[in-house]
């Protein structure tokens, strides 16, 4: 499943692509604790695509929905407000976590 599937047609006219990452997202849903996933950014929002047992799941976040992004021990950590908490991406297979975190944090300010 191609999780980096965002195209120009998905963007608002004012949006431009930013960095993206693929890897393993650590997030508990029922009895599963990790999923293959991707984060894709634009200058206006962040997309999260996840392979949930062969089914694509997409969630879109405004930057106002994100507290911060950081890199710890080669893992990307996205911190969301209360409710979702922190989601880690480990085993990053494409993209640069430091560049990604810096881009997201720049959009927050």
Question: What is each model feature region?
Answer:
Residues 95-109:
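Terminal and domain-flanking low-complexity segments
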Residues 16-25, 54-58, 95-96:
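Hydrophobic transmembrane alpha-helix bundles
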Residues 27-92:
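Phosphoinositide-binding peripheral membrane targeting modules
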Residues 1, 7, 70-76, 94, ...:
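Generic structural signal for short, solvent-exposed loop/turn connectors between secondary structure elements
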Residues 1-39, 81, 103:
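Anionic N-terminal interaction surfaces
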């Amino acid at each position: 499943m191609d999780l980096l599937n965002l195209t120009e047609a998905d963007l608002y006219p004012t949006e431009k692509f930013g960095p993206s990452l693929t890897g393993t997202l650590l997030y508990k849903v029922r009895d599963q604790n990790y999923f293959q996933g991707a984060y894709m950014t634009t200058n206006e929002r962040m997309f999260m695509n996840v392979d949930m047992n062969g089914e694509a799941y997409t969630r879109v976040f405004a930057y106002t929905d994100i507290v911060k992004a950081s890199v710890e021990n080669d893992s990307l950590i996205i911190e969301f407000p209360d409710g979702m908490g922190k989601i880690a991406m480990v085993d990053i297979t494409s993209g640069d976590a430091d560049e990604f975190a810096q881009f997201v944090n720049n959009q927050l300010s």
